[in-house]
From Swiss-Prot:
The active site is at residue 112. GO terms for cellular component: cytosol. Keywords: Isomerase. The lineage of its organism: Bacteria, Bacillati, Cyanobacteriota, Cyanophyceae, Nostocales. InterPro entries: NagB/RpiA_transferase-like, Ribose5P_isomerase_typA_subgr, Ribose5P_isomerase_type_A. HAMAP family: Rib_5P_isom_A. It comes from Nostoc sp. (strain PCC 7120 / SAG 25.82 / UTEX 2576). Belongs to the ribose 5-phosphate isomerase family. Homodimer. It comes from the Bacteria. GO terms for biological process: D-ribose metabolic process; pentose-phosphate shunt, non-oxidative branch. NCBIfam families: PRK00702.1, rpiA. This is Ribose-5-phosphate isomerase A. Its EC number is 5.3.1.6. Gene3D superfamilies: 3.30.70.260, 3.40.50.1360.
Length: 236
């Protein structure tokens, strides 16, 4: 592990390490997407190399987590080859006091939702800046849409009071394309008072594959903080 003086990076490393420490030998592990979860994958690889951890297999939620797992020596499998997931570890863009989440900043929320909801235990890893009183306070709700339906879905979301914006690529001309080959609308709402209902309403729009509201699924939230220049991890 590369040592860095940056306290934010150190914090992410500590949260990732704390999550990796919860994985037991023989586990089937859902591997999330994002900068903090990347450290979890790295620490899982370290534990495997040292012999502290044995006989685990990971199920990646994105091309990013698949590439990192191969890089750090974490064996992989697919949902076709297993009948359960013991533990999933993933990040979030927002976490409310009820442990409801907004995810999808990396456009991987569809695969993440499949894996995270299947897991017997779902661990969320975030920094303290991701904690909010109400979902949608800072982050828009990502909605994955099949390309041919982008216009009718946009119109339907506007009728719900949402303000959708097509996510554009960085270092790529045109819109972001998900691992499933779809577009992402980032939708802002003035207030998300009932995330459970909003998740269902959005998913009932024809052409929507999945949205980034995750409700009633997180078992443990590990929160990283920096105090007096030192990284700390606490549990919600």
């Amino acid at each position: 592990m590369t040592v860095t003086a940056d306290p934010v990076t150190l914090m992410k490393q500590e949260v990732g390490k704390a999550a990796a420490a919860l994985v037991k030998s023989g586990s089937i592990v859902g591997l999330g997407t994002g900068s903090t979860t990347a450290y979890t994958i790295q620490y899982l690889g370290d534990r495997l190399k040292s012999g502290e951890l044995t006989d685990i297999v990971g199920i990646p939620t994105s091309f990013q987590s698949e590439v990192l797992s191969k890089q750090y020596g974490v064996p992989l499998t697919t949902l076709d080859a297993v009948d359960h997931i013991d533990i999933a570890i993933d990040g979030a863009d927002e976490v409310d006091p009820h442990k409801n989440l907004i995810k999808g900043g990396g456009a991987a929320h569809t695969r993440e939702k499949v894996v995270d909801y299947l897991a017997n235990q779902f661990i969320v890893v975030v920094d303290s800046g991701k904690l909010v009183d109400r979902l949608g306070s800072v982050f828009a709700v990502p909605v994955e849409v099949i390309p041919m339906a982008i216009t009718p879905v946009t119109n339907a979301i506007k009728q719900l009071g949402g303000k959708p914006e097509l996510r554009m690529g960085v270092k790529k001309a045109g819109p972001v394309i998900t691992d499933q080959g779809n577009f992402v609308l980032d939708v802002r709402f003035d207030s998300i008072d009932d995330p459970v209902n909003l998740e269902k309403i959005l998913n009932n729009i024809p052409g929507v594959l999945e949205n980034g509201i995750f409700v009633n699924c997180a078992d443990i939230v590990l929160v990283g903080e920096v105090k007096d220049g030192q990284p700390l991890v606490r549990r919600l």
